[in-house]
Curated annotation (Swiss-Prot):
SMART domains: Ribosomal_S4, S4
Record's keyword annotation contains Ribonucleoprotein: yes
The protein, known as: Small ribosomal subunit protein uS4
Primary gene name: rpsD
Lineage: Bacteria, Bacillati, Bacillota, Clostridia, Eubacteriales
UniProt keyword Acyltransferase present: no
InterPro entries from the UniProt entry: Ribosomal_uS4, Ribosomal_uS4_bac-type, Ribosomal_uS4_CS, Ribosomal_uS4_N, S4_RNA-bd, S4_RNA-bd_sf
Keywords recorded for this protein, A-Z: Ribonucleoprotein, Ribosomal protein, RNA-binding, rRNA-binding
Superkingdom of this protein's organism: Bacteria
GO biological process: one example: ribosomal small subunit biogenesis
UniProt family annotation: Belongs to the universal ribosomal protein uS4 family.
Gene Ontology, cellular component aspect: small ribosomal subunit
């Protein structure tokens, strides 16, 4: 299955809420949800009541789209979550939050998860001093994520550094603005994850 390459705004309209796929644009009146808050397509304005399965499926799709993950990988994360101790749904969100591209976004060094994924792929970040260009890399407590030294002076990273200065960060991440680096000081708890995801519906869907 290929990665989605269409218009990001269509995904937000499909889910009926902002997925913040375009960074700051999503907070302005240019946002597609603000202008056309209904699903795309000929029958988008005709809302119909979803079945139980439909609600579960929509919640799973929404979570996938927040993090930019394909179905196969998302299911593997769910299987990992099942094997971990604790509540499966919360384990799943914890795994998703631990992806390197998400951590870069949470640090404020990318305006969206999509941009974070591109920056990681292009080799602009290190983990514990070693270059890592795999967006799905799962960070651990104690890991230090930093902008590669050669990349710090690039116009893009300097722009993102300024952007990061005004961004709130979750308490499980420490951020050093001068070094353009962050440290994972704890695993994210459910209350640290500010996304409107009903993970229990995803668990119900995959448990059938």
């Amino acid at each position: 299955m290929a990665r989605y390459t269409g218009a990001s705004c269509r995904l937000c309209r499909r889910e009926g809420e902002k997925l913040y796929l375009k960074g700051e644009r999503c907070t302005t009146n240019k946002c597609a949800i603000a202008r056309r808050g209904y699903a795309p397509g000929q029958h988008g304005q005709n809302k119909k009541k979803l079945s139980e399965y439909g609600l579960q499926l929509r919640e799973k799709q929404k979570a996938r789209r927040y993090y930019g993950i394909l179905e196969g990988q998302f299911r593997r994360y769910f299987e990992m979550a099942v094997k971990k101790k604790g509540i499966t749904g919360e384990n799943l969100l914890q795994i998703l939050e631990s992806r390197l591209d998400n951590v870069v976004y949470r640090m404020g060094l990318a305006v969206s998860r999509r941009e974070a994924r591109q920056l990681v792929r292009h080799g602009h970040f290190t983990v514990n001093g070693k270059r890592v260009d795999i967006p799905s890399y799962l960070v651990k407590v104690g890991d230090v994520i930093a902008v590669k030294e050669k990349s710090k002076s690039s116009p893009k990273m300097q722009s993102n550094k300024e952007y990061a200065a005004g961004r709130p960060r979750p308490k499980w991440l420490e951020y050093d603005a001068e070094e353009m680096s962050g440290k994972v000081v704890a695993l994210p708890a459910r209350e640290d994850i500010d996304l409107p995801i009903r993970e229990n519906l995803i668990v119900e869907l995959y448990s059938k």
